[in-house]
């Protein structure tokens, strides 16, 4: 998306459209990946460890990359994770996913071609906080009818 269109209203419109799709097709969970800038995992160890220790998906949603692509996320012990620094340095998209209720897989993939490290994201619909459902649902019906 072009930088000039990355504002709050555009993101909200995208989320309302996603929510309309989820409702229309009765989807149980949304999955995908999110990227952390950088391929030197020693520089993003605190962020990866934070996701591993504090925001890991439940066992029934757990997944990890293929062994040949797997990068360990548990790089710093839970007690040594600088939570404040991790939260401040995580990409806005990952923080947004976390606010809504998303969780993360076990293991990351370094993508040198794009200069990022990717993590698996799962958002079971049943775990989305009610306030977000109410917020994004106000226009969802209109979007579904227009489609």
Predicted regions and their residues:
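Short, well-ordered beta-strand micro-motif
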Residues: 120-124
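Short, cationic low-complexity segments
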Residues: 139-147
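Acyl-donor binding region in acyl/amide transferases
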Residues: 1-103, 108-117, 128
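Long, contiguous binding/interaction regions
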Residues: 127-136
């Amino acid at each position: 998306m072009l930088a000039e269109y990355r504002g709050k209203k555009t993101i909200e419109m995208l989320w309302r459209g996603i929510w309309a799709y989820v409702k229309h097709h009765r989807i149980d969970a949304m999955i995908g990946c999110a990227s952390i800038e950088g391929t030197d995992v020693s520089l993003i160890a605190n962020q990866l460890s934070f996701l591993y220790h504090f925001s890991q998906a439940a066992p029934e949603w757990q997944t990890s990359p293929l062994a040949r692509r797997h990068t360990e996320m548990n790089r710093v012990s839970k007690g040594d994770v600088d939570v404040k620094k991790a939260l401040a340095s995580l990409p806005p998209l990952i923080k947004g996913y976390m606010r809504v209720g998303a969780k993360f897989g076990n293991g990351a993939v370094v993508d040198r071609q794009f200069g990022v490290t990717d993590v698996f994201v799962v958002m079971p619909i049943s775990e989305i906080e009610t306030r977000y459902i109410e917020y994004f649902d106000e226009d969802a019906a209109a979007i579904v009818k227009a489609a």
